[in-house]
Amino acid sequence: DTIQSRGLGDVYKRQVDVSTSSRATLGGMTGNNSCGARSIRYGKMVDNVLGVEALLQNGEKIQFGEVDPKSLNGKHPSTRDHLLQQLFQIGIREADEVRQRFPEVQRRVGGYNIDELIPPDHGVLNPARLLVGSEGTLAFSTSIHLKLQPIPTHKVLGVCHFPSFYEAMDSTQHLVTLNPDAVELVDRTMIELARSIPQFAEKLKKFVMGEPDSLLLVEFTGEELKPLQAKLSELKAMMASLGFQDAVVEAIDPAFQKEVWDVRKSGLNIMMSMKGDDKPVSCIEDCAVELKDLAEYTSRLNHLFEKYGTTGTWYAHASVGCLHVRPVLNMKKEQGASVM
């Protein structure tokens, strides 16, 4: 938020826009390969890091960035060249295994990004991307060169209402074909808890119609407003074709949109306001699946919750098949720990 509020932020911004932006740091976001609500448009942190200056274990400072492996000095390599040669050999050696086994999901952030070491057709590699997501285990970053993009002039938001959680998850794969910047989930639990919090109750009245089981917040951005309004019309038409007539609340006014996003960005705080000893527990959070599997994945996990006599809370990044999911457990009792 500090970066966004300064001069550069008036025109350009880092597009990895995490909900914890008020306290997140660029080093931390690079270390864990952060994503944010708009990663369907702007990608993960690894897609936005151009270079990293880092300290190695021996204290030597090295600049990592785009490099052609053919340009490295093979006869008298520097520490940097020798290290990069070894990394590129790993990429060549493991290329087939990576292509065969790495999951094809947009939110793959587990482990090291060794796929970034595989030689591409154009021959240029960027080993800085290996450091992204490594959480300080490979080197200590001292400076980070980021790709910045213009802030869109206009934004619009469609709040899509669904009578069941399964239908919301199944519909996501269709909604993303409209090329939105974000598709974010708000489930029934968050809606009900937010209604009990004065800070959010009045805001919900403006964009929640009736008693939906789930909401999907679909955002479009661009340089002109009229095409975005047309996108909202397309969204409503698609919802109707999926069987959900008159199920979209339009948010065109920026102040109205902010109220909607305020609720979504406070998702964790809202969930943790659950009264009593039963609380959403983070133990299986942030699994990512392909969108075609999202409805089945969430359905099977809900059945697992039922098997153990509990429920789960769900919210966040439906657009890329990565939801924040937490089973509701009483960790003050042995049974809660056992179920976890």
Description of each model-found segment:
Residues E167-D170, E223-L232, E296, E334-V339:
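Short, conserved charged micro-motifs
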Residues M29-R38, V124-L148, A316-C322, R326:
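Conserved phosphate/anionic-ligand binding catalytic regions in large, soluble enzymes, centered on
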Residues I151-F162, S214, K275-L291:
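Short glycine-/aliphatic-rich beta-strand segments at the starts of folded cytosolic domains
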Residues D1-Y12:
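Single conserved hydrophobic/aromatic residue that forms the stacking wall/gate
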Residues D10-G51, L56, R108-N126, F140:
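A gly/ser-rich beta-alpha-beta helix-loop segment of oxidoreductase catalytic cores
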Residues V11, D170-S171:
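Active-site loops and adjacent core secondary-structure elements that bind or stabilize anionic groups
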Residues K75-I118, V124:
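Flexible inter-domain linker/hinge segments
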Residues I144-L148, L178-D278, G312, A316-A318, ...:
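Terminal amphipathic helices with adjacent charged low-complexity linkers/tails
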